Swiss-Prot record:
F-type ATPases have 2 components, CF(1) - the catalytic core - and CF(0) - the membrane proton channel. CF(1) has five subunits: alpha(3), beta(3), gamma(1), delta(1), epsilon(1). CF(0) has three main subunits: a(1), b(2) and c(9-12). The alpha and beta chains form an alternating ring which encloses part of the gamma chain. CF(1) is attached to CF(0) by a central stalk formed by the gamma and epsilon chains, while a peripheral stalk is formed by the delta and b chains. It is found in: Cell membrane. Its main location: membrane. This is ATP synthase subunit beta. It comes from Bacillus licheniformis (strain ATCC 14580 / DSM 13 / JCM 2505 / CCUG 7422 / NBRC 12200 / NCIMB 9375 / NCTC 10341 / NRRL NRS-1264 / Gibson 46). Gene3D superfamilies: 2.40.10.170, Bovine Mitochondrial F1-atpase, Atp Synthase Beta Chain, Chain D, domain 3 (1.10.1140.10), P-loop containing nucleotide triphosphate hydrolases (3.40.50.300). Produces ATP from ADP in the presence of a proton gradient across the membrane. The catalytic sites are hosted primarily by the beta subunits. GO terms for cellular component: plasma membrane; proton-transporting ATP synthase complex. It holds the Pfam family ATP-synt_ab. SUPFAM superfamilies: C-terminal domain of alpha and beta subunits of F1 ATP synthase, N-terminal domain of alpha and beta subunits of F1 ATP synthase, P-loop containing nucleoside triphosphate hydrolases. The lineage of its organism: Bacteria, Bacillati, Bacillota, Bacilli, Bacillales. Keywords: ATP synthesis, ATP-binding, Cell membrane, CF(1), Hydrogen ion transport, Ion transport, Membrane, Nucleotide-binding, Translocase, Transport. It is a peripheral membrane protein.
């Protein structure tokens, strides 16, 4: 291992000079350690990542933690490889930082735990799976109208308090229970409190044992926030490539990844591009997203929360992300206010998998009919608000009646919310979902009260609920 000395410290940017003509490769990890000599000093154990070659045997690096206490002349050791993080079953149920160090107050990982570097090539063309396979989630509104693809990328849009976290938890639970799948959660630029809450909620709901969690919180330097998504992805890739698993990979929030990249770019002195973003925005996004894919062995399916600055979808950060997405799930506050959970907007959510060749003719026809009837209901709402239901034609009254049943039937109880609602969660297979909506659209349940359709799973549960309400079925 070659040694050098710190020559300059500029916040999260540290320059290191090496001797004997040695120059570490780009992305190599460099370690700076220093034992405090007196009470005015602090112990330093800092990892840097090489970002630029400056010439004269010097490199410019980005710090993965605070550089407080680092001074010129401190010894820096080139580790000769990129940052490496633990992978495999030892990561399940644990919480890590960007360097793969556990931060959950449990026992440290065994010293001989397998490790992989966070920088690697995307899978080669001949390793990619060309089959388009639907990932059944058991959540009706998702499976029917915006189905997820195994190895695909899904954008999850939603404000505060509309149910993003609960939807993420339910997806983790359903994949674990029904498919025996593993999940990796990467909190990128997250609020520490939210990450903490998520950890304890997952512990309480029992899904933590199938999940690895990685956090680079909001208060950490941009280097940590930019690399933490790669740390999580490396853990997910191991389960895909070495164990043939179908892995679910959550990133919250992908915008913070871009934001951290922008900060690093400015610190390295690069000329900013449009709206102040880094000129390498598309490259950085591509390097991350291209590694998230299906191979002949397994798949990594990613669900990414996306913050849209000032609701401007043409902003370079969300616009660059959209190019990579296969499906979008939009959460709508109005639906959560109506008590419809999950509050997924059935008209704004999209998926490239919703075509007859992929989901089948029947599923496609039912999904399109559901969207048409909900769209017509939306158009009629202004008339209803002004003139009331009585002014509608008989045909439109029937549309409204069925649309409301459809809207309520798109809701369902979640397993992870059982302790709050007191009602059992439901996992609904796609076939049952399609059958239920088809029968509602055909008018088979026009005689049942609307409330019987609210927060249930299969269509049979609607009939049972109606019986409990004293309605003759």
């Amino acid at each position: 291992m070659k040694k050098g000395r710190v020559s300059q410290v500029l916040g999260p940017v540290v320059d290191v000079r090496f001797e004997d003509g040695h120059l570490p490769e780009i992305y190599n990890a460099i370690k700076v350690t220093h034992k405090a000599q007196n009470e005015n000093e602090v112990d330093i154990d800092l990892t840097l990542e090489v970002a630029l070659h400056l010439g004269d045997d010097s490199v410019r690096t980005i710090a993965m933690a605070s550089t407080d206490g680092v001074t010129r002349g401190m010894e820096a050791i080139d580790l000769g490889e990129p940052i490496s993080v633990p992978v495999g079953n030892v990561t399940l149920g644990r919480v890590f930082n960007v360097l793969g160090e556990n931060i959950d107050l449990d026992e440290p990982l065994p010293a001989d735990a397998a490790k992989d570097p966070i920088h690697r090539e995307a899978p080669k063309f001949d390793q990619l799976s060309t089959e388009v396979e639907i990932l059944e989630t058991g959540i009706k509104v998702v499976d029917l109208l915006a189905p997820y693809i195994k190895g695909g990328k899904i954008g999850l849009f939603g404000g505060a308090g509309v149910g993003k976290t609960v939807l993420i938890q339910e997806l983790i639970n359903n994949i674990a229970q029904e498919h025996g799948g593993i999940s990796v959660f990467a909190g990128v630029g997250e609020r520490t409190r939210e990450g903490n809450d998520l950890y304890y909620e997952m512990k309480d709901s029992g899904v933590i044992g199938k999940t690895a969690m990685v956090f680079g919180q909001m208060n950490e330097p941009p280097g940590a926030r930019m690399r933490v998504a790669l740390t999580g992805l490396t853990m997910a890739e191991h389960f895909r490539d070495k164990e043939g698993q179908d892995v679910l990979f959550f990133i919250d929030n992908i915008f913070r990844f871009t934001q951290a990249g922008s900060e690093v770019s400015a610190l390295l002195g690069r000329m900013p591009s449009a709206v102040g973003y880094q000129p390498t925005l598309a490259t950085e996004m591509g390097q991350l997203q291209e590694r998230i894919t299906s191979t002949n062995v397994g798949s990594v399916t990613s669900i990414q929360a996306i913050y849209v600055p000032a609701d401007d979808y043409t902003d370079p950060a969300p616009a660059t992300t959209f190019a990579h997405l296969d499906a979008t799930t939009n959460l709508e506050r109005k639906l959560s206010e109506m008590g419809i959970y999950p509050a997924v907007d059935p008209l704004a959510s999209t998926s490239r998998a919703l075509s007859p060749e992929i989901v089948g003719e029947e599923h496609y026809e039912v999904a399109r009919s559901v969207q048409q009837i909900l769209q017509r209901y939306k158009e009629l709402q202004d008339i209803i608000a002004m003139l009331g239901m009585d002014e509608l034609s008989d045909e439109d009254k029937l549309v409204v009646s069925r649309a409301r049943r459809v809207q309520f039937f798109l809701s369902q109880n979640f397993h992870v919310a059982e302790q709050f609602t007191g009602q059992k969660g439901s996992y609904v297979p796609v076939k049952e979902t399609v059958k239920g909506f088809k029968e509602i659209l055909e008018g088979k349940y026009d005689h049942l009260p609307e409330d019987a359709f609210r927060l249930v799973g299969r269509i049979e549960e609607v009939v049972e609920k109606a019986k409990e309400m004293g309605v003759e079925v």
